[in-house]
Amino acid sequence: MTNIRKSHPLMKIINNAFIDLPAPSNISSWWNFGSLLGICLILQILTGLFLAMHYTSDTTTAFSSVAHICRDVNYGWIIRYLHANGASMFFICLFIHVGRGLYYGSYMFLETWNIGVILLFTVMATAFMGYVLPWGQMSFWGATVITNLLSAIPYIGTDLVEWIWGGFSVDKATLTRFFAFHFILPFIITALAAVHLLFLHETGSNNPTGISSDMDKIPFHPYYTIKDILGALFMMLILLILVLFSPDLLGDPDNYTPANPLNTPPHIKPEWYFLFAYAILRSIPNKLGGVLALVASILILILMPMLHTSKQRSMMFRPLSQCLFWMLVADLITLTWIGGQPVEHPFIIIGQLASILYFLIILVLMPITSIIENNLLKW
């Protein structure tokens, strides 16, 4: 008799994706983050569902309903902080996952990579709309500033912004629709993640060497299931330390003040995971130019396969490219720091230089360095 997991139509899909999946024998812990993202997504959907049971998406009661969740709902505080800090863990895993893809040349799987970029955009949109929901000062002004950027689009800009707002300013209609979108998008993300996985399993996983591992595969279970569980335990440990010891570490104190359209906070800034893009936006004095740079900073990922000039896929044996990669990481950390600073000297010039360097490394230095490395190996 055939094993039910290999014959049952539904079990067969799960079996081929998570149990009998042939995986390279040498993938490192950098390959753990895909499964960690899946865990983050499940955690966010579950905590979000319980929060939605008590939250009200009305400008007069939204702030109070979040306070009510924290004070009166059984374990509401832990659900709220798991959700808020879970988003931070989600983005840490996302950035490492994308960084792994860049380092080891995983972007050569075109369909998987492009779906991944779409996923990144969708998760960023979801997180932005979620940040608006508590209706604190930073929620309101963050929503006003970021949506207002669309007015830079020629001809249709103003109409587009008013259409998104549902009025002439960020108000009740905006909050209600943001809640609706914030609720539905994670399910769209889940569907996209399934497609992401589908395309990945067409080719099989990449590995640190960047060369084919078809001759040396091992079953996903038990080898990588146990490895993923260890990674998940580490992540949950970090998340719980954050939630139980310093839940507001990554938040903004301004968001504990109810939204007031008549009082602008001194420094409007998004959550930490958007600061690098916010710094790039602010470093260009022109509104439309800034918006284009902001979009380009993420959209540039789609160009990665076209910018790959090396004869080797991975950076494992390319020390010059490795130096550039870590320069890029340092540059992104610098941009993140600048995004949280006020717009004054010397932060303006540091932000502008870091923004130029970001695009320079990806568009110019990396492709040229790859060609130099090819020539050094006389290829």
From Swiss-Prot:
Binds 2 heme b groups non-covalently. Pfam families: Cytochrom_B_C, Cytochrome_B. It is found in: Mitochondrion inner membrane. Heme b b566 binds at residues 97, 196. The keyword Phosphoprotein does not apply. CDD domains: cytochrome_b_C (cd00290), Cytochrome_b_N (cd00284). GO terms for biological process: mitochondrial electron transport, ubiquinol to cytochrome c. Its cofactor is heme b. Heme b b562 binds at residues 83, 182. The chain crosses the membrane at residues 33-53, 77-98, 113-133, 178-198, 226-246, 288-308, 320-340, 347-367. A ubiquinone binds at residue 201. Keywords: Electron transport, Heme, Iron, Membrane, Metal-binding, Mitochondrion, Mitochondrion inner membrane, Respiratory chain, Transmembrane, Transmembrane helix, Transport, Ubiquinone. GO terms for molecular function: metal ion binding; ubiquinol-cytochrome-c reductase activity. It is a multi-pass membrane protein. GO terms for cellular component: mitochondrial inner membrane; respiratory chain complex III. Heme 1 (or BL or b562) is low-potential and absorbs at about 562 nm, and heme 2 (or BH or b566) is high-potential and absorbs at about 566 nm. The cytochrome bc1 complex contains 11 subunits: 3 respiratory subunits (MT-CYB, CYC1 and UQCRFS1), 2 core proteins (UQCRC1 and UQCRC2) and 6 low-molecular weight proteins (UQCRH/QCR6, UQCRB/QCR7, UQCRQ/QCR8, UQCR10/QCR9, UQCR11/QCR10 and a cleavage product of UQCRFS1). This cytochrome bc1 complex then forms a dimer. Belongs to the cytochrome b family. Component of the ubiquinol-cytochrome c reductase complex (complex III or cytochrome b-c1 complex) that is part of the mitochondrial respiratory chain. The b-c1 complex mediates electron transfer from ubiquinol to cytochrome c. Contributes to the generation of a proton gradient across the mitochondrial membrane that is then used for ATP synthesis. This is Cytochrome b. It comes from Sus philippensis. The gene is MT-CYB.
